[in-house]
Amino acid sequence: SILACLPLFPSFGCTVTLWYPVIYGVNMVTFPTPLETRKLAELVEKYSVTVMISTPTFLRGYLRGVHREQLGSLRLVVTGAEKLPKTVSEAFEERFGKRVLEGYGLTETSPVSNVNLPDPEPLGEDGDGHVWLPSYRPGSVGQLMPGLAVRITDPETGGPRVIHQSRRSWLKGAD
């Protein structure tokens, strides 16, 4: 089940906490505001919520007055809408034992273009398999979503740019 408390007027909240659960038949635990984190933590615990999609600003609220066991059922915590500060990510993981996965997007990508993913289970009968691509890297917004292409350019010249420098990203979808 998913905790559905993000405002619905931005595409992020509308798409990931309303339309995704409705289309895919995922149970939703709804609450009208993401600001009342103590009440939300009670709901997570009461209904054994497994997915929480939030923003870094709202995650900060859980760090004040929410107990570790209240978020024990969560298997996936994803943030978007703003940069995830390392301090918030580390504090949340330390306090609740849950890795926070950061994503990136904009309204035009409805609303996700990149997202970090939980680490996959190792392949192979003995558990000694390998993974082709890392699914999570701290400080990044994760892998590009399937169906998108990206061109990375220098923001000043428009020329090609390598990925670990200041840059402009151009996204293109199928249409």
Question: Which residues fall in each region the model found?
Answer:
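Conserved AMP-binding/adenylation subdomain of ANL enzymes
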Residues: 1, 9-50, 65
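Short, well-ordered beta-strand segments
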Residues: 1-4, 169-170
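AMP-binding (ANL) adenylation modules
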Residues: 6-10, 156, 174-175
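Membrane-embedded alpha-helices of multi-pass transport/permease systems
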Residues: 15, 56-59
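Gly/Ser/Thr-rich phosphate-binding loop
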Residues: 26, 49-54, 63-136, 149, ...
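Short acidic loop-to-helix transition motifs that present clustered carboxylates
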Residues: 35-38, 60, 84-85
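Beta->alpha turn/N-cap motifs
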Residues: 55-56, 175
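Conserved beta-loop-beta connector loops within the AMP-binding
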Residues: 144-172
